[in-house]
Amino acid sequence: MNLILFDDNDRLDAQRMHLRDPVRLRHLREIHRAVPGDELSVGLIGGALGHGRLQSLDDTGAIFTVTLDRNPPAPLPVHLLLALPRPRMLARTLEHVTALGVKQLTLLHTRRVEKSYWQSPELTPEKVRHHLILGLEQARDTHLPSVTFEPRFKPFIEDRLPAQLSGRRALIAHPGMATTCPRGLDEPVTLAIGPEGGFVPYEVERFEALGFEGVHLGERILRVETAVTALLARLF
């Protein structure tokens, strides 16, 4: 991890934090090889970045004296609509999009998403939060994305999505579209990305009826996690 993240439950007082998570304690020892007196990059979830001096480290936890005096990186102005990936891909995808700066993510059901994916233990709040935090630690960011789940396509696209599009450019990435994905946008974007195999024609039509512009990344068919990274890097 490139950043040690604390939350308010870790706070001892105005300047001291107590890290108790066994996984991160092991990381401190084995990867950072941290010893008392070392200074490391730290942040407060939902707050500022800064540095922390390790005061003590034992089996019960690590105590840091912290100074939080820097803003986190600017978020991407994007609402990502992503067809729910396969469970083994979901963890990596959550980490990648968080590291890239996505702050609004909707995971939705589409025709080619297997219904069993929605019963995956990877969708528990604890698992999702764990992977979001790993993404923040990678990118040295502190603000968790908002993640919503839409297990029914039609009610979402008819009843909830239209109100979320005001003032935003809407794009749907899908193979075979006529327009190349634009570059370097400086406006809010809603970006829809389908599952492995893409959206079915009915789904594309429903997005286009709401004003979504169809875009592509070229002739190559990419895995979803690769396409997400490539699209976000190109758009912003």
Regions found by a protein language model. Give the residues of each.
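N-terminal positively charged helical leader segments and presequences
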Residues: 1-70
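Short, ordered loop/turn segments at secondary-structure junctions
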Residues: 9, 69, 109-113, 219-220
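Hydrophobic side chains in well-ordered alpha-helices
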Residues: 28, 90-93, 203
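Short secondary-structure boundary segments
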Residues: 44, 109-110, 174-177, 195, ...
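Structured adenosyl-cofactor binding patch, chiefly the S-adenosyl-L-methionine
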Residues: 201-236
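RNA substrate-binding interface of SAM-dependent RNA methyltransferases
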Residues: 71-169
